[in-house]
């Protein structure tokens, strides 16, 4: 198992970057409204995709992004990825990764999880959140396949899921993992000061007891950053048979690495590519902050001395694209797309 603690010193301590090949596309942005499977209410998603035209700087929910808003999709066939953000978070906190992957030929649909986002935390600590988040990602996969703008340009292969923090838990459930709620209770007895995992003292609110963890056979690979995974032992992970790329920081003050990413990497039945970043904390995976964000959320912007967030993000963009290209098939340039070709049968 690749459990070597990859210190990635060049990335973390400001070593020189290898020249990056110029991205062949610009990142497009498409706004999507879906139906939340939990309560049948509208839910939002942002789709980043390889686009034609020119990108422009815009600001969405306080995050500056460079995109071509609702521009035509570039001609070709592209793998589909779905991004799941952390508890009370925003997919825009990972905009650098979504736009970077779009420029390299991936369609990235970033769900805003209802009841567990920066504006609305009402489902935090509930069963409807734990089991509803994967259902929302599955709904996003179906919606993307059926979307008039995106659908004709998606390849026929499996789908990748990117999960950050609690989004890692979501990705694992979609891959076949079965959460063990007793593990959460036991963990919170041992470490009651873990304010993030133990907000409800290890007992989730059974607001929707009829819900259950549901895997999605369309998922073919996962990329996890600082994953929340303490509810998964070996037995709970036995059905997870997809390739995984896992990143974590060894200075994560929010999620205990030994009980989350490190334990997960040991227990997955398919050996993951596990990369431990020296000195990095939980928030190193979030987009670099501008002056306004530094003033508003300093704790999320600041890294330990010697940790270079820009270099880490460059590595994430490059290596995530390579990982999904190998696992799902590489993006394909094309003079025409499925929109002008013969009808095909896609995985919906």
What does each model-found stretch correspond to?
Residues 88, 92-95, 112-135, 143, ...:
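Cap/lid segment of the alpha/beta-hydrolase catalytic domain
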Residues 54-55, 66-78, 83-120, 253-257:
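Short substrate-entry loop that stabilizes the transition state in hydrolases
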